[in-house]
């Protein structure tokens, strides 16, 4: 460090060395300043003016700054860009400091560890995720620090990792330095951490300390070592950034794929669960479902959608709770009560991290006062799940009383502003406040007492910022000043004195405000520590309120949208009567055309044909969405649904280039198809829409035929397979498990009319030119297209006929199959040769 730097800059550089990868916000008066490369980067990211302060190596030192009172807005913008920030505060007193004011980093904010309300999306989990790979295993661990959840999982394939990242959308990824990552990880803020943080023994030590155990057998130490290393690395990072204990992280939850209906990354995207195809939040499944009353419920609903359950028994407990809420007509009253509840989940996390603000505690108190009303509203409910919820939302009278006596009703935003602790809570604080606020009255009282005691009529008490408090006497009466008056200042006409009593009063008054603030801060910290003992009960309360909110919301959606409860049965199959699309139907002005569907083990595939825009993709997607909704416990848009056991949903719908990975549309399509063909089982629901379009007609049709046949006869998955290759409609003749259906359309007055009804049999034409006309293709182009189509149909179709799928058997081969060579005599063999020669000649002529 150069000695030419000022002491302040030397201090800055010392602190900055500990945070090389973070932007250091260095407090100087009313601003947070940034220097050197931090200043350049911040000026670009935040559009700040870049100035200079001092020099380093004969060059001006770049500087940029933000006002301290507006720092939260700037932090939010930086976090969205994936940046991490270290906040360095002045902790010394400028008035008494010799040299630079003492400073230290008091707060580290990273995208995955932020818990401040102002910096978070209230309706979205904020996830920090760590990845570790070893021995063909991918271990992942993730934490929602604001929600107190800590999970781990072990994977075997990169596509599984991609699916989890798409589902969780982590704000920050941790991995070991120099670890190669798949291209899809580039969409996230990645932090490379030192290798020792991914050490097995270090992970074991940290995790045992966190959960107060001697071994990790309960968390699967033997079976999931890679995931536990990731969990340990994640915990090490949290310890570094939070600089304190994490009492709200009390358990580590192992997620196992066999417990959930699996949705790969493509399926989550194609079904538009959380965002539409353009990346927006409107017109997706979540936007239709999420009418939750509180942020906790909204976040939980999204987690349910991302991880549909497989166990019918658990799903049915949710169904029973929803049925009961509907029957008792509780959805409106409960919604209104829950709407008044605070985000208890995140408040608990801030209490655990000692970063809860005064208004957090007031919001928590308001929620506690609502619990008796919510509990009373649920008195008639008898379903298993609601009974469990009732147990967790019982009142907490001692905590409620503590908060009522400790905090005023409308406190300031920050404890540093004072005026948070209620009068009467602490005698010493009340005295300090009285000294500060009643100084004038006390001064008048002291003056009168001294006059009475001394009999000096000119005696006055005064104050100025230089001399402090003083007793003033005229020159005439000064000679009568009592011995305990100590001269402080001599002026032309008066003498000023101080007494031990007045000095004591001065010390108390002048320091009362700062002492009151310090006392209040101490009391507030102690209050947070006292509330921490209620973290288990408050965490359970938060989970139960969120769960109740989701159940009430699903009950309201079922009634408002005319949805019905699906039947989950052990027998295999999928049956949907009058199914509708859950997203499209509410958006339509006209009536949605409902359609039936039935898939069973001996008839497990529907081969769907029909025109573009005729509703094939809608029919397929609504089937998958009805299945998915059934597996979160929701009612569904259908008159009746019966579902047997299912393990996965796969989709291959639509495609576009993957420019980041250098993959063409056809390559994306084939990659997704390959994953389906390798991973699907007889209990999977598979949607395949138009494969083979990105290559030649012959290759495309051959791939479509082979994929269709393999799914139907080898995998035997429940499959909806749409195609424009009409030649494929011959497949049911070869495979009895395949059924042809089509979406109806007709031509009226020269215009195509889509009927959107699914009918038995195959379409007899594709209506491609009619759809092109609707799209606005110029008439001269359409005329030329019609002429060319007629020429093709009159001569030879560019599409190979059915023989491509099942070529006609050669007469020669047919005859050869009949022969048993061991039984032929010499004469019969000679006759056969002539016969085959004759057949071959006839075949070549044809």
From Swiss-Prot:
Designated name of the protein: DNA mismatch repair protein MutS
Entries under CDD domains matching the protein: ABC_MutS1
Residue positions binding ATP: 610-617
Pfam families: MutS_I, MutS_II, MutS_III, MutS_IV, MutS_V
SUPFAM superfamilies noted in UniProt: DNA repair protein MutS, domain I, DNA repair protein MutS, domain II, DNA repair protein MutS, domain III, P-loop containing nucleoside triphosphate hydrolases
Cellular compartments per GO CC: cytosol
Organism: Legionella pneumophila (strain Paris)
Function per UniProt: This protein is involved in the repair of mismatches in DNA. It is possible that it carries out the mismatch recognition step. This protein has a weak ATPase activity.
Matches recorded under InterPro entries: DNA_mismatch_repair_MutS, DNA_mismatch_repair_MutS-lik_N, DNA_mismatch_repair_MutS/MSH, DNA_mismatch_repair_MutS_C, DNA_mismatch_repair_MutS_clamp, DNA_mismatch_repair_MutS_core, DNA_mismatch_repair_MutS_N, DNA_mismatch_repair_MutS_sf
GO biological process, one term: mismatch repair
Gene3D superfamilies per record: 1.10.1420.10, 6.10.140.430, DNA repair protein MutS, domain I, MutS, connector domain, P-loop containing nucleotide triphosphate hydrolases
GO MF terms held by the record: ATP binding; ATP-dependent DNA damage sensor activity; damaged DNA binding; mismatched DNA binding
Family: Belongs to the DNA mismatch repair MutS family.
Disulfide bonds: none
Cytoplasm found in the keyword field: no
Keywords linked to the UniProt accession: ATP-binding, DNA damage, DNA repair, DNA-binding, Nucleotide-binding
Superkingdom to which the source organism belongs: Bacteria
């Amino acid at each position: 460090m150069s000695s030419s730097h000022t002491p302040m800059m030397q201090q800055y550089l010392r602190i900055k060395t500990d945070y090389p990868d973070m932007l250091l916000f260095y407090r100087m008066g009313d601003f947070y300043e940034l220097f050197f490369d931090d200043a350049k980067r911040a000026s670009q990211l935040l559009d700040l003016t870049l100035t200079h302060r001092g020099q380093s190596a004969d060059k001006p030192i770049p500087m940029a700054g933000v006002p301290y009172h507006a720092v939260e807005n700037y932090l939010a913008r930086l976090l969205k860009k994936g940046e991490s920030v270290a906040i360095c505060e002045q902790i010394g007193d400028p008035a008494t400091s010799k040299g630079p004011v003492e400073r230290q980093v008091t707060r580290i904010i990273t995208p995955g560890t932020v818990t401040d309300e102002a910096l978070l999306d209230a309706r979205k989990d904020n996830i920090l995720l760590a990845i570790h790979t070893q021995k063909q295993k991918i271990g992942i661990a993730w934490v929602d620090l604001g929600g107190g959840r800590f999970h781990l999982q072990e994977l075997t394939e990169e596509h599984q990792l991609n699916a989890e990242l798409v589902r969780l959308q982590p704000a920050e990824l941790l991995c070991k330095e120099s670890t190669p990552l798949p291209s899809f990880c580039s969409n996230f803020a990645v932090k490379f951490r030192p290798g020792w943080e991914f050490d097995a023994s270090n992970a074991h030590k940290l995790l045992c300390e966190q959960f107060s155990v001697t071994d990790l057998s309960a968390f699967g130490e033997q079976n999931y070592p890679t995931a536990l290393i990731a969990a340990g690395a994640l915990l090490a990072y949290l310890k570094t950034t939070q600089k304190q204990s994490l009492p709200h992280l009390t358990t580590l939850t192992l997620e196992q794929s066999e417990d959930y209906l699996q949705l790969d990354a493509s399926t989550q995207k194609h079904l538009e669960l959380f965002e539409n195809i353009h990346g927006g939040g409107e017109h997706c499944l979540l936007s239709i479902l999420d009418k939750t009353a509180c942020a906790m419920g909204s976040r939980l609903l999204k987690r349910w959608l991302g991880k549909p359950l497989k166990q019918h028994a658990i799903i049915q407990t949710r169904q029973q709770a929803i049925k009961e809420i509907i029957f008792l007509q509780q959805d409106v009253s409960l919604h209104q009560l829950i709407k008044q509840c605070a985000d208890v989940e995140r408040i608990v996390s801030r209490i655990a991290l000692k970063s809860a603000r005064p208004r957090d505690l007031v919001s928590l108190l308001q929620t506690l006062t609502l619990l008796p009303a919510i509990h009373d509203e649920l008195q008639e409910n008898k379903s298993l799940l609601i009974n469990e919820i009732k147990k967790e939302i019982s009142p907490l009278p001692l905590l409620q009383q503590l908060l009522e006596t400790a905090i005023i009703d409308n406190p300031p935003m920050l404890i540093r502003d004072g005026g948070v602790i209620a009068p009467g809570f602490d005698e010493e604080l009340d005295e300090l406040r009285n000294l500060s606020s009643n100084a004038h009255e006390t001064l008048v009282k002291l003056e009168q007492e001294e006059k009475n005691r001394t009999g000096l009529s000119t005696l006055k008490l005064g104050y100025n910022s230089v001399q402090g408090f003083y007793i003033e006497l005229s020159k005439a009466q000064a000679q009568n000043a009592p011995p305990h008056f100590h001269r402080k200042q001599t002026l032309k006409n008066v003498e000023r004195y101080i007494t031990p009593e007045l000095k004591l009063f001065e010390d108390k008054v002048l320091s009362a405000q700062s002492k009151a603030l310090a006392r209040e801060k101490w009391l507030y910290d102690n209050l947070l520590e006292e509330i921490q003992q209620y973290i288990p009960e408050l965490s359970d309360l938060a989970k139960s309120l969120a769960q109740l909110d989701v159940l009430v919301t699903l009950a309201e959606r079922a009634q408002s949208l005319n949805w019905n409860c699906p039947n989950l049965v052990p027998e295999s199959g999928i049956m949907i009567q009058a199914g509708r699309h859950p997203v499209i139907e509410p958006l339509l002005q006209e009536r949605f055309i409902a359609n039936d569907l039935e898939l069973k083990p001996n008839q497990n595939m529907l081969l769907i044909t029909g025109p573009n825009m005729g509703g094939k993709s809608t029919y397929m997607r609504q089937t998958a969405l009805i299945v998915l909704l059934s597996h979160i416990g929701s009612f569904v848009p259908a008159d009746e649904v019966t579902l047997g056991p299912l393990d996965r949903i796969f989709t291959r719908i639509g495609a576009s280039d993957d420019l980041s990975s250098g993959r063409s549309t056809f390559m994306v399509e084939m990659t997704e198809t390959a994953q389906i063909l390798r991973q699907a089982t007889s209990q999977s629901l598979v949607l395949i829409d138009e494969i083979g379009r990105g290559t030649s007609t012959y290759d495309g049709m051959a791939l479509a035929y082979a994929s269709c046949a393999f799914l139907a006869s080898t995998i035997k998955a429940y499959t909806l397979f749409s195609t424009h290759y009409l030649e494929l409609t011959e497949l049911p003749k070869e495979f009895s498990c395949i059924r042809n259906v089509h979406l109806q359309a007709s031509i009226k007055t020269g215009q195509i009319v889509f009927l959107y009804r699914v009918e038995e049999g195959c379409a007899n034409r594709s209506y491609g030119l009619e759809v092109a006309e609707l799209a606005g293709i110029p008439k001269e182009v359409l005329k030329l297209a019609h002429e060319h189509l007629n020429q093709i149909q009159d001569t030879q179709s560019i599409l190979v006929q059915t023989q491509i799928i099942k070529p006609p058997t050669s007469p020669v081969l047919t005859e050869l199959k009949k022969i048993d060579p061991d039984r032929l005599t010499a004469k019969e063999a000679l006759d056969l040769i002539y016969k085959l020669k004759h057949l071959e000649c006839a075949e070549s002529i044809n």
